[in-house]
């Protein structure tokens, strides 16, 4: 009996050691976040083992775990009709909210899920619940795009998928089929989905063939650049769940089908050192010392290397492509963008990407709403139902939907 108690105590201690990580006191539901992070880390470690054994690519294994535990079939309710279909060969899940008697045509949001261009799905519970809530509360049609993921495809194929599906949806006959007002359409996405939404928004402003334009764009903690991994938010949240800095850098390398040997050099900004001539032209477009308010820069110092590794940018020219890094787009492109909503979280390495983009858009004359949550963490908006229900998740979702309701 005594030995059993000792063993149980040891196991509990080991579990607590694995789960516990130091978190800022201001983050929402810290113990719940620790448990969520421990679960995700455990899944990552299992997928890495599978990769090491040669059984599958680690991202395929990890996404199999995520989708297996969270996939939801297209289930319609009394209020929202849900169907799986494809738009020009790209899978989508369509949520049709209830019509308003006084409005024969509905508004619409094209939504792009996050997951580092490699994980998640439009068909998992978290995104299904978000899009169902949007469709019902906005009396809208929500198109959630099931774009292809790394490692099956790499940049820029994810962009091609979302552009192809959205262009198909914008056809007059398709909008008519879903009873959508062509003047009330928004593009939106979270994290890597926010990146794709921003890239699509920029591309559509330059596409003269499009008869129907987007009214709004709404970007949720978007990832917008891979040239400076030492912004104040990257420094402040270097190990903050659920997106530590090294994980974000690896997502970028995976997206570009790059070499993992580059990761450590990129973490210290060796890929954009002063001797890398290719990066010089865009350096000012992400100069956080001028783009961020003093309340965010605090006492952090820029990390600018004098000499670095020019080979990285030469082998990964995608780093300097505005389709992957919308933050570095020309001002002439930015000034054509529609009214914009950007949601950022304090405890997120990507916080400053969103804030800098908001500043650049405002400087280009675009009307921007920057919605910042002091207790938010990366990914929080999709965590709204038990057992992963967070207070800040519910508040961010409500704030996002409220803005859409008032502006779309």
From Swiss-Prot:
Gene Ontology CC terms: endoplasmic reticulum membrane; membrane; plasma membrane
Membrane topology field: Single-pass type II membrane protein
Entries under Pfam families matching the protein: Abhydrolase_3
Lumenal topological domain: 26-408
Classification via Gene3D superfamilies: alpha/beta hydrolase (3.40.50.1820)
Catalysed reactions, semicolon-separated: a 1-O-alkyl-2-acetyl-sn-glycerol + H2O = a 1-O-alkyl-sn-glycerol + acetate + H(+); 1-O-hexadecyl-2-acetyl-sn-glycerol + H2O = 1-O-hexadecyl-sn-glycerol + acetate + H(+); a cholesterol ester + H2O = cholesterol + a fatty acid + H(+); cholesteryl (9Z-octadecenoate) + H2O = cholesterol + (9Z)-octadecenoate + H(+)
List of glycosylated residues: 270, 287, 389
Catalytic residues identified in the record: 191, 348, 378
Record InterPro entries: AB_hydrolase_3, AB_hydrolase_fold, Arylacetamide_deacetylase, GDXG_lipolytic_enzyme, Lipase_GDXG_put_SER_AS
Presence of keyword Glycoprotein: yes
PTM field: N-glycosylated.
Ranges in coiled-coil conformation: none
Motif (Involved in the stabilization of the negatively charged intermediate by the formation of the oxyanion hole): 113-115
EC class: hydrolase
Family, similarity comment: Belongs to the 'GDXG' lipolytic enzyme family.
Protein name: Neutral cholesterol ester hydrolase 1
Species in which this protein is naturally found: Homo sapiens (Human)
Lineage, opening ranks: Eukaryota, Metazoa, Chordata, Craniata, Vertebrata
Gene assigned in the entry: NCEH1
């Amino acid at each position: 009996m005594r030995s059993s108690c000792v063993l149980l105590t040891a196991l509990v201690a080991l579990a607590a050691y694995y789960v516990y990580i130091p978190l800022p006191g201001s983050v929402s539901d810290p113990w719940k976040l620790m448990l969520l992070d421990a679960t995700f880390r455990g899944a990552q470690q299992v997928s890495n083992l599978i990769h090491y054994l040669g059984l599958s690519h680690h991202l395929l294994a990890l996404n199999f775990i995520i989708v297996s535990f969270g996939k939801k079939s297209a289930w319609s309710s009394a209020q929202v009709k849900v169907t799986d279909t494809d738009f020009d060969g790209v899978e989508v899940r369509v949520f049709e909210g209830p019509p308003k008697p006084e409005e024969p045509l509905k508004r619409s949001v094209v939504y792009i899920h996050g997951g580092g261009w490699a994980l998640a799905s439009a068909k998992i519970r978290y995104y299904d619940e978000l899009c169902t809530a949007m469709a019902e509360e906005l009396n809208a049609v929500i198109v959630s795009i099931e774009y292809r993921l790394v490692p099956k495809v790499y940049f820029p194929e994810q962009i091609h998928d979302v552009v192809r599906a959205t262009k198909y949806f914008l056809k007059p006959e398709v909008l008519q089929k879903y009873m959508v007002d062509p003047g009330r359409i928004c593009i939106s996405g979270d994290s890597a989905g926010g990146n794709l939404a921003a890239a699509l928004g920029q591309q559509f402003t330059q596409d003269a063939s499009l008869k129907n334009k987007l009214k709004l764009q709404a970007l949720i903690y978007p990832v917008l650049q891979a040239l400076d991994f030492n912004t104040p938010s990257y420094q402040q949240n270097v190990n903050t769940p659920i997106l530590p800095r090294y994980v974000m850098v690896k997502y970028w390398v995976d997206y570009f089908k790059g070499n993992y040997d580059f990761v450590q050099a990129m973490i210290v900004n060796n890929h954009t050192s002063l001797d890398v001539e290719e990066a010089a032209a865009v350096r000012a477009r992400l100069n956080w010392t001028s783009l961020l308010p003093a309340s965010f820069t605090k006492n952090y110092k820029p990390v600018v290397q004098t000499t670095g590794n020019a080979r990285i940018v030469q082998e990964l020219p995608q780093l300097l492509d505005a389709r992957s890094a919308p933050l570095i787009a020309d001002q002439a492109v930015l000034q054509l963008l529609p009214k914009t909503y950007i949601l950022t979280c304090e405890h997120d390495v990507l916080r400053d990407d969103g804030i800098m983009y908001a500043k650049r858009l405002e400087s280009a004359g675009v009307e921007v709403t920057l919605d910042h949550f002091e207790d938010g963490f990366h990914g929080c908006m999709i965590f709204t139902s038990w057992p992963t229900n967070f207070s800040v998740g519910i508040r961010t979702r409500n704030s996002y939907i409220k803005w859409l309701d008032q502006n779309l």
